[in-house]
């Protein structure tokens, strides 16, 4: 073997070694639940579901481990909100200012704001990590129920561009205010929000849709938790799957002369498609109630007495 050929073989072997080292150093390992979730630290509350999904409470998660993992993934998170109606402008101002301060701080965030033509967007201090995109909802759709208009519009935006822009997406109601950090402990493939009031009721008789002909129907004696409708999260693909099921359910009910609520359709979806992560009532506390001892920090608050 001549020296030139030997040199080429050595260089080839060296390049393979560099490539292997690069991918080893840049590979993001999957995060195990036990790496960041410590349910025994909160014996006063339910911290796992029957299908072993974590229920995130303050004190159950290791923020440093989560931060290290998601920073290596270099993620972008989307937050979609729908603002129309009498109090929409006031709510949107509080929502966006508080979200800009507490939602996924230190990460790239794209806010998707869906509004009617008459709404004045609030001034927000610009940041390199924050992008705000406003979309006017088609006026021809206003005869439809609000949740139906919003979800149909959100589904169209996910298909056309959101799925290519973010790794995770949250859809939240505008009549909420972030009060403490809403961070990467909330991320997952399919994330549900426990209903703040129903979580603390000692009953299995949740207000599910019970009419058997409704697409949202859950029979008596069945069901896991009662989920609130103010927030849903996950990957864009999973959010789109939910939206498609919700819209199909609404069409089914209309054909049968029924009109079930968005929240009941949401609960039916999570009954059939178990969420991979649940957020405690700390992440959507109703200001109409005094927090019980289990609520250590209210992350997000809403006022159920005021309607849009």
UniProtKB/Swiss-Prot annotation:
Provide the membrane topology annotation. Single-pass type II membrane protein
What does the record give as the active site?
A: 263 (nucleophile)
Location of the protein in the cell: Membrane
Q: What class of enzyme is it?
A: transferase
Residue ranges, Lumenal compartment? Answer: 24-308
Annotated GO biological process: carbohydrate metabolic process; lipid glycosylation
Q: Name one GO molecular function term.
A: hexosyltransferase activity
Q: Could you list this entry's UniProt keywords, alphabetically sorted.
A: Glycoprotein, Glycosyltransferase, Membrane, Signal-anchor, Transferase, Transmembrane, Transmembrane helix
Q: What protein name does the entry list?
A: Glycosyltransferase 6 domain-containing protein 1
């Amino acid at each position: 073997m001549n020296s030139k050929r030997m040199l080429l073989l050595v260089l080839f072997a060296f390049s393979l070694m560099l490539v292997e080292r690069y991918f080893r150093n840049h590979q993001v390992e999957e995060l195990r639940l036990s790496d960041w979730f410590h349910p025994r630290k909160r014996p006063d509350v339910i911290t796992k579901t029957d299908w072993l999904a974590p229920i995130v409470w303050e004190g159950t998660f290791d923020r440093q481990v989560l931060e290290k993992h998601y920073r290596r993934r270099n993620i972008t998170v989307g937050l979609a909100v729908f603002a129309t109606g009498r109090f929409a402008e006031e709510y949107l101002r509080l929502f966006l200012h508080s979200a800009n301060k507490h939602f996924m701080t230190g990460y790239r965030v794209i806010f998707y704001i869906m509004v009617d033509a008459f709404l004045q967007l609030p001034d927000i201090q610009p940041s390199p990590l924050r992008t705000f995109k406003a979309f006017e909802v088609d006026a021809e759709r206003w005869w439809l129920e609000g949740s139906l208009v919003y979800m149909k519009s959100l589904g169209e935006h996910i298909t056309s561009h959101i799925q290519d822009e973010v790794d995770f997406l949250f859809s939240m109601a505008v009549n909420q205010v972030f009060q403490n950090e809403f961070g990467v402990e909330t991320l997952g493939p399919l994330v549900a929000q426990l209903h703040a009031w129903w979580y603390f009721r000692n009953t299995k008789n949740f207000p599910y849709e019970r009419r058997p002909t409704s697409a949202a129907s859950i029979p008596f004696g069945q069901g896991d938790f009662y989920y609130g409708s103010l927030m849903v999260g996950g990957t864009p693909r999973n959010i789109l799957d939910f939206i498609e099921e919700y819209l199909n359910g609404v069409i089914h009910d209309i054909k049968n002369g029924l009109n079930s609520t968005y929240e009941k359709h949401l609960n039916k979806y999570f009954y059939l498609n178990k969420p991979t992560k649940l957020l405690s009532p700390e992440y959507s506390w109703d200001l109409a109630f005094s927090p019980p001892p289990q609520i250590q920090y209210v992350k997000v608050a809403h006022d159920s007495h005021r309607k849009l």
